[in-house]
């Protein structure tokens, strides 16, 4: 009987990209960070949930900081040095994700707020009464 061929695992190739864009999406429940090249191809990504935070802990600034540090480390492995940052969403992890990316050692050239603002479009969800 022939021996079954083991599945081949391809090692990630090391891309040599010097500058890129960090997309930080901070919602009320989670924070997602994707670092891409100038064309928009994802190089590295991370989120609060991917770092092991569950439930309401995902929406904390600390969880956003841990996720940003992880995505930043992955991007530095590909040779990335300078970043433009695009932040969108109303969540609490926006500022801490920015500081974490700066702490990893990136040279940040610009910060843009890409949060979509409606010109009185859809009806908003009902207000919370606590």
From Swiss-Prot:
Part of the 30S ribosomal subunit. Interacts with proteins S7 and S18. Binds to IF-3. Keywords: Ribonucleoprotein, Ribosomal protein, RNA-binding, rRNA-binding. One of its GO terms (cellular component) is ribonucleoprotein complex. Pfam families: Ribosomal_S11. Belongs to the universal ribosomal protein uS11 family. This is Small ribosomal subunit protein uS11. Located on the platform of the 30S subunit, it bridges several disparate RNA helices of the 16S rRNA. Forms part of the Shine-Dalgarno cleft in the 70S ribosome. One of its GO terms (biological process) is translation. PROSITE patterns: RIBOSOMAL_S11 (PS00054).
